[in-house]
UniProtKB/Swiss-Prot annotation:
Family listed: Belongs to the archaeal N-glycosylase/DNA lyase (AGOG) family.
Protein name in the entry: N-glycosylase/DNA lyase
Record note on domains: Contains two alpha-helical subdomains, with the 8-oxoguanine binding site located in a cleft at their interface. Contains a helix-hairpin-helix (HhH) structural motif and a Gly/Pro-rich sequence followed by a conserved Asp (HhH-GPD motif).
Active-site residues (renumbered): 142 (schiff-base intermediate with dna), 174
BP terms from Gene Ontology: base-excision repair
């Protein structure tokens, strides 16, 4: 049943949710205005990689990030986060571990150019593999796949172009997705949602975009009537 509902919503429905309902996308759009495009993309990837063990809702954390860096000159991402994280309201845990991760990824981020951003946006699996290799972590780990999702948002904003996410990249296993999966099956979240992705022809990162805001209580009133009806059906199944 859930595969059928996701198929009905489709990639275009997921795109509507991403661009009009997901607060993370709204926060990035706000931050991007007046900011250097490459620096914006670098910051978004870095922030996604430290978006775990939060001390508040993910939506609030991304708005905190966007407001903090709006109009701010960033000399190095590491020095900026050394100041930002200890004073953050929504990301106060494991600060040293997160700073170490920023330090590891910054040399790679500093190589990004407009050309390489376009190249990675054309094939997001390349970025996925590159980030995992630099950090020496499993490429299916939550923050690595999540960083590709947020890169997709950032690239879409700066390039004014929509490219769907690749089917191969699994869903980020965050608390909301894990809880929902337990309600539906005994399978591992990434395996279950990959199966749903193939059945519905909607890539896992777009499935995440559909589910995650709805599980967080997002309202769907502004969706077009046909999509709104489909989302309300899905909400009855997942909430």
């Amino acid at each position: 049943m859930i595969a059928e509902l996701i198929r009905e919503i489709g990639i275009e429905g997921a795109r509507f949710i991403e661009e009009n309902i997901d607060e993370q996308f709204k926060a990035l759009s706000y931050l991007s205005e007046g900011m250097d495009r490459v620096n914006f993309v670098r910051l978004v990837i870095a922030n996604a990689l430290v978006s775990y063990q939060l001390t508040g809702k993910g939506e609030m954390w991304w708005w905190e990030f966007a407001k903090y860096f709006k109009g701010k000159e960033v000399k190095t991402i590491y020095s900026a986060y050394k100041e930002f994280l200890p004073n953050s309201k929504f990301n106060r845990r494991l600060i040293q571990q997160k700073l170490l991760r920023i330090k590891k990824i910054e040399p790679f981020l500093s190589t990004l150019t407009e050309e390489s951003i376009e190249r990675y946006y054309e094939d997001m699996t390349l970025l996925w593999k590159a980030i995992a290799k630099v950090l020496k972590v499993d490429r299916e780990s939550k923050t690595v796949v999540f960083s590709v999702k947020m890169f997709g948002y950032a690239a879409r904003i700066v390039l004014s172009k929509f490219n769907p996410y690749p089917m191969e990249i699994p869903i980020p296993e965050d608390v909301r997705i894990i809880k929902l999966t337990r309600k539906l099956t005994n399978e591992r979240p990434r395996d279950f949602w990959m199966k749903i992705a193939k059945e519905s022809n909607v890539p896992p990162l777009h499935i995440d975009s559909i589910l995650w805001p709805l599980l967080g209580g997002a309202r769907v009133e502004e969706a077009p009537p046909e999509l709104k009806e489909k989302l309300e059906k899905l909400i009855r199944v997942i909430r």
